Amino acid sequence: MINAKGRYLFSSESVTEGHPDKVADQISDGILDAILAQDPDAHVACETLVTTGLAFIAGEITTKAYADFPSIVRETVKEIGYNSSTMGFDWETCAVISSVDKQSVDIAQGVSRTKPEDQGAGDQGMMFGFACDETETLMPAPIYWAHKLSRRLTEVRKSGVLDFLRPDGKTQVAVEYVDGKPVRIDNVVVASQHAENISHADLCDAVKKEVIFHTLPESLVDKNTKIYINTTGRFVIGGPMGDCGLTGRKIIQDTYGGMGNHGGGAFSGKDPSKVDRSGAYMARYVAKNMVASGACKRCEVQIAYCIGVAEPLSVLVTSMGSSDIPDEALTKAVREVFDLRPYYISKRLDLKRPIYKPTSCYGHFGREQAGFTWEVTDAAADLRTALKI
């Protein structure tokens, strides 16, 4: 799609940490982190459902650690900002129910091995990684700016700059491309939960000033950029009271905003033995290093696994037409530079740590901060050597 010629629009959306699906993701990853902090080899598959006044935890967890589910839920909800029963979700009074079993022994025997390096994949499936040179973090422009807007919505709410905002919110950005290159932002959509006493006009003016124009660069916004804010006119009922939230329902905004492909697997609540997560992180690491190496301007990586088998069944690297180097040569270089077996992915990216809760909001990729080891471009030189460029 991004190779299209001519002029076209591409849109991506993001949601804030108060969106019900993201509340669920944060709880699942909060539980995962609490367990990994005590037991790095734990096997965790933790799912969360949130609705009015209730959080339900389910899944399969095999560990020597203890995690206080109610405390983790309440602390997470408190951090997000649901602190009143009038919002339909209050960290002090919400009910917490759990039903958790151990991981199936049939799955465990495919993952656990006498030699750690022979660790099999925790499931079958294919994972995709993507990178492009549209932004400084090598992420597509639409999702990059959508996440920026969502983070700003939360920032002005928590800092009190716009104290009438509430935790739930969504953003969407449509970028205009010419021959595959982003040239301007055509339209912006913001939906933000708010207090009942703010008028629609005042809310729109404040969000334009403090969120949209504060965040988006003048070079991409012009007089023809269209802005849509709370277009139903009212967004008082939100969060888990407005919609039931579930872990793993925001997989596109978690990744590349629809730019490139997606294997279908969610991330939150899963330990790194689950290749849905670790394989996708590795695919991003490979793709980003390939673009950083200068070998191509865009790169997509697909890795496929079989449960209980260490070696990937297939690996494909494509420049999507952005390089003179054949895809076959790019793929060969990746196989030379990277060991894509699950044990070595976890070891190289140091994934058996409590690093996951920060990933659960505003995208798992394009975040160049401590803990996001898959965003480091330390393999670019090795790829240049392998490709002889």
Curated annotation (Swiss-Prot):
Listed Pfam families: S-AdoMet_synt_C, S-AdoMet_synt_M, S-AdoMet_synt_N
Q: According to its UniProt record, which cofactors does this protein need?
A: Mg(2+); K(+)
Principal place where this protein is found? cytoplasm
- Source organism superkingdom: Bacteria
Entry binding sites for ATP: H19, D168, G169, K170, R234, F235, D243, R249, K250, A266, K270
Q: Which residues bind Mg(2+)?
A: D21
Q: What is its EC number?
A: 2.5.1.6
Alphabetical list of InterPro entries matching this protein:
ADOMET_SYNTHASE_CS (IPR022631), S-AdoMet_synt_C (IPR022630), S-AdoMet_synt_central (IPR022629), S-AdoMet_synt_N (IPR022628), S-AdoMet_synthetase (IPR002133), S-AdoMet_synthetase_sfam (IPR022636)
* Catalysed reactions, as listed in the record: L-methionine + ATP + H2O = S-adenosyl-L-methionine + phosphate + diphosphate
Family recorded in the similarity comment: Belongs to the AdoMet synthase family.
Q: How the protein assembles, per its UniProt entry? A: Homotetramer; dimer of dimers.
Name the chain's protein: S-adenosylmethionine synthase
Q: What are the top taxonomic ranks of the organism?
A: Bacteria, Pseudomonadati, Thermodesulfobacteriota, Desulfovibrionia, Desulfovibrionales
